[in-house]
Amino acid sequence: AVMATDGPLLILAGAGSGKTRVLTHRTAYLIEECGVNPYNIMAITFTNKAAGEMRERIDQMVGYGSESIWVCTFHSTCVRILRRYIDRLGFGTNFTIYDSDDQKTLMKDICKRLEIDTKMYKEKMFLSAISSAKDELIDPIEFETRAAGDYVKRKQAQVYREYQQALKQNNALDFDDLIMKTVELFKLDKEVLASYQDRFRYIMVDEYQDTNTAQFELI
């Protein structure tokens, strides 16, 4: 697996069998044996802890030049890209990232403004529906189209639309937006997409089986 460097490769093995070690050794092999520039390699993980551990291992194995390799989570990868190019989607590059408390506060305001009975329709329910939609790359317009005939879904669609408008007015993204907006950017701007495709010739994803639709599309 370490020496299979051309085309896609999926590694299936049990927990603790060394899948992550394969990624770090493959990175070293690409640089030392295949002459690949570290600048052209990306390694993606799901958690900051896993990214930190992988970064440490790669630094130890590769040494000089390893700082050019992108070793980060899906979300931190997207933040780096969006900080450079999100202005092409009508946001400022100094956008704020909303945490769960910010989201709850915003949702409370929206429900109040739309006069929604939050005893019957919980704010948490709306946030969960919006998060699930974003994981599937479903924007408010498509959500509304799919909601036809279902009262609760139509209510969710209305809230989703208001929620996204409020985020944009506040120059803010929530956690799920980070991936969704990066995919949107790549679809909208072929020049930006091409620059990253040209840079990252070798992309390795740890725990790939856990990717959702948005993460899969991003890769």
What are these language model-derived features?
Residues 19, 23, 28-29, 213-219:
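Conserved RecA-like helicase ATPase core segment
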Residues 6-9, 28-202, 213:
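A basic/glycine-biased coupling hinge at the interface between accessory DNA-binding modules
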